[in-house]
């Protein structure tokens, strides 16, 4: 009955954009369980949601050490000719990879998308080939990318379900960058840019991810909500205005969020905080073996299966007859997030304080 009522509310007073079709998916990014769907496999123009794939590739290049956050990204003549939204960087001028990431997320800069495509793959065409190869790996069956920014192109097509898959992967594979999506403004080359996602200023449980708009696509969003251990991801295509898009996605997210959340603007909570809570330190216990060799093998297994664990300190301590392996963290939320990631891989963990 609740789904029927939501579908009725979802359809009332909608005048469809000229080319776009309303589509939405709401679900859990970790389990891929879908709670709500409308036209989830209908092909639409993804507009700037295309940049989520561009960002995924950037993060992957950083992880593989083929890029560094301090690397310079130069703007070619071709990049400077890109249509707005753009930074307007002059030909042969540059920004860093670190700045470019913020420019894609906050400003949604199309010229920056071309510049990074050229840096990674030599030219836009080769980068698009890479984008589609990644899409195939991510099982985005109804997606074809034609550029790295999402400006109008008849061949640049995707679906709400495929963008849900892509957004889920960027959340799972690169959680260390999630706080970047929650930024409401950024400074680049002496200019301050404000986010297009005004929901970030109103609700402290939303963490990005990306908005998009062209005349043919309508207003779109990929939106992540985090409340303690409750992750909810919403995709919405085809709004007639930013206000309508925000109202509709917020309505749907509220219906399917499992826990109540505060609307405190002043204390925006990010996925991982590096603050100490009451001077406590936390340990995530990951294994207990009689032989130290097995403990070491288990740590290697964890690091291979769960990328985020590679950036944390692991230690093994003997307790009686057993060798106990731990991950040391500074706060309870980080401990819970890591433990949840471990459990999602059908492995055990235990949180302890010290």
Segment roles from a protein language model:
Residues 2-3, 136, 285:
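Terminal, positively biased "leader/anchor" segments
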Residues 3-14:
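Sec-dependent N-terminal signal peptides
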Residues 50, 77-79, 91-93, 118-120, ...:
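A mature extracytoplasmic/lumenal domain signature
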